[in-house]
Amino acid sequence: MTEYKLVVVGAGGVGKSALTIQLIQNHFVDEYDPTIEDSYRKQVVIDGETCLLDILDTAGQEEYSAMRDQYMRTGEGFLLVFAVNSAKSFEDIGTYREQIKRVKDAEEVPMVLVGNKCDLASWNVQNEQAREVAKQYGIPYIETSAKTRMGVDDAFYTLVREIRKDKDNKGRKGRKTNKPNRRFKCKML
């Protein structure tokens, strides 16, 4: 069974833990208890393949930013979560994305942009803004509500599909060359 290491990142209070717990335990946690770092595992079937999701729910607070590099190194894919009622959390997404790319030393890393709290009446980040940013980044955009469970499975499952696509692309690049494999022998002088 394939295991996928997913990391949920975003500013404090955007609903990272609520999304993760909704996926894992099917219930909404409405009290806010800032996370330092929590890990969850769940077996699911995505596109006919049984797989194990290893989800790291991270701290959004700035005082825990020193821990970020470590979890970014180990993650295979990232949910970039912002709250639709917080323009600041949306602005922070670019910083998270750049940090992930720097730590992973890669231009393309599997990511999904997630606009959470879509059940709220007032939005400070419009759908079009988020779609435009996702398009610029070349990543999918999913709207979610941890409260109503809208889009929760879709967000995590889309990230798994992005990881699979990334692995397929890297596999093809590695096999593409038509040049014969030449080995050079070292000579000690």
From Swiss-Prot:
It catalyses: GTP + H2O = GDP + phosphate + H(+). The gene is Ras85D. A lipid is attached at C186 (S-geranylgeranyl cysteine). InterPro entries: P-loop_NTPase, Small_GTP-bd, Small_GTPase, Small_GTPase_Ras-type. PANTHER family: RAS, DI-RAS, AND RHEB FAMILY MEMBERS OF SMALL GTPASE SUPERFAMILY. This is Ras-like protein 1. Keywords: Cell membrane, GTP-binding, Hydrolase, Lipoprotein, Membrane, Methylation, Nucleotide-binding, Prenylation. Pfam families: Ras. Ras proteins bind GDP/GTP and possess intrinsic GTPase activity. Plays a role in eye development by regulating cell growth, survival of postmitotic ommatidial cells and differentiation of photoreceptor cells. During larval development, mediates Ptth/tor signaling leading to the production of ecdysone, a hormone required for the initiation of metamorphosis. The modification Cysteine methyl ester is found at C186. Belongs to the small GTPase superfamily. Ras family. Disulfide bonds: none annotated. A motif (Effector region) lies at residues 32-40. The keyword Nuclease does not apply.
